[in-house]
């Protein structure tokens, strides 16, 4: 069973692995099939699910909600995360993709997510990306309104720099619960830019998206040395796959990230969560780092 972890001081308790529904519309599941899939990953202990208003051209939340309408009892077995703050041209009124983090939009978006997801509350709402026009006071007003109304229990951000995180936190009477960021052997800037250090300092656990590099790990020739090293480490650890080793590499970080799994295949989810049992050494971790970036530590 997947470990459970409190992700921040006074924050929610989530499963250590998170089920990501970004690509739900690509899985071509009926509502009944989706119910079965949800039941299967809940049985594995993956109880936290990750959504965003824009996923699937604004369709993924509603598709998930249709499944919950068929099995409403499943809602009490899961924690639902969603995001807002990006507007895309998938909606006719948007002539250009842009960010929107004003008070009314955040509230309206969260309320629409509740309708779409067939639930009465979100366990966590995130601002999806930093907005150059973000007024931190307005965001704080929206968060406080949603909290007081009982519609959202906890709040966080995604893809924020430490300075952006600190700015928003300075306006809030409660602790931000997470910063959902890209962490992968093929994307390592956050390891040294202070993002994960800030979260470790605050005892806040990041959520990690694109752990497998959006497929680059498997199909980019540049990362062949990384694939080779992952295969060697997989043999050393008796791991089932190089994917499993990547998840173990992320779990080794002291900020204690929660990896988001983006697959609609239950076997891949099962393999991913088994990475918790792998004990990666410090030298194995640095071998993987070097294979990905192409050079040794200074």
Model-identified regions with their sequence ranges:
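N-terminal binding-site loop/beta-alpha segment at the start of enzyme catalytic domains
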Residues: 1-78, 297
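Beta/alpha (TIM)-barrel catalytic core signal, keyed to glycine-rich beta->alpha loops juxtaposed to Asp/Glu
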Residues: 4, 130-298
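Acidic (Asp/Glu)-rich catalytic clusters
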Residues: 8-11, 67-79, 114-118, 147, ...
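Short, acidic/polar
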Residues: 28-41, 101-116, 165
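Alpha-helix N-cap and loop-to-helix initiation/capping positions
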Residues: 29-36, 59, 63, 97-105, ...
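Structural motif corresponding to the early beta-alpha repeats
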Residues: 75-101
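CE4/NodB-like, metal-dependent polysaccharide N-deacetylase domain
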Residues: 105-126, 146-149
């Amino acid at each position: 069973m997947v470990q459970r972890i409190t992700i921040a001081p006074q924050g929610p308790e989530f499963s250590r692995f998170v089920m990501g529904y970004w690509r739900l519309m690509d899985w071509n599941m009926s509502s009944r099939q989706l119910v079965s899939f949800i039941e299967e990953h809940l049985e594995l202990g993956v109880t936290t699910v990750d959504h965003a208003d824009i996923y699937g051209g604004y369709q993924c939340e509603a598709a998930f909600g249709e499944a919950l309408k068929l099995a409403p009892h499943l809602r009490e077995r899961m924690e639902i995360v969603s995001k807002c703050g990006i507007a895309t041209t998938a909606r006719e009124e948007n002539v250009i993709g842009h960010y929107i983090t004003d008070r009314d939009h955040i509230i309206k978006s969260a309320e629409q997510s509740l309708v779409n997801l067939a639930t009465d509350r979100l366990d966590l709402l995130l601002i999806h990306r930093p907005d150059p026009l973000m007024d931190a006071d307005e965001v704080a007003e929206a968060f406080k309104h949603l909290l007081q109304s009982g519609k959202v229990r906890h709040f966080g951000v995604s893809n924020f720099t430490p300075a952006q995180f600190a700015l928003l936190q300075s306006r809030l009477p409660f602790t931000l619960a997470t910063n959902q960021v890209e962490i992968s052997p093929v994307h390592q800037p956050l390891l040294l830019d202070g993002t994960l250090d800030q979260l470790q300092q605050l005892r806040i656990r990041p959520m990690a998206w694109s752990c497998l590099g959006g497929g680059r790990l498997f199909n980019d020739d540049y990362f062949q040395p990384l694939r080779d090293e992952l295969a060697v480490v997989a043999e050393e650890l008796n791991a089932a796959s190089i994917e499993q080793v990547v998840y173990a590499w992320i779990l080794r970080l002291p900020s204690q990230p929660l990896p988001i799994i983006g697959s609609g295949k239950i076997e891949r989810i099962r393999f991913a969560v088994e990475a918790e049992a792998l004990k990666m050494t410090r030298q194995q971790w640095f071998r993987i780092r070097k294979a990905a970036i192409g050079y040794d530590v200074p």
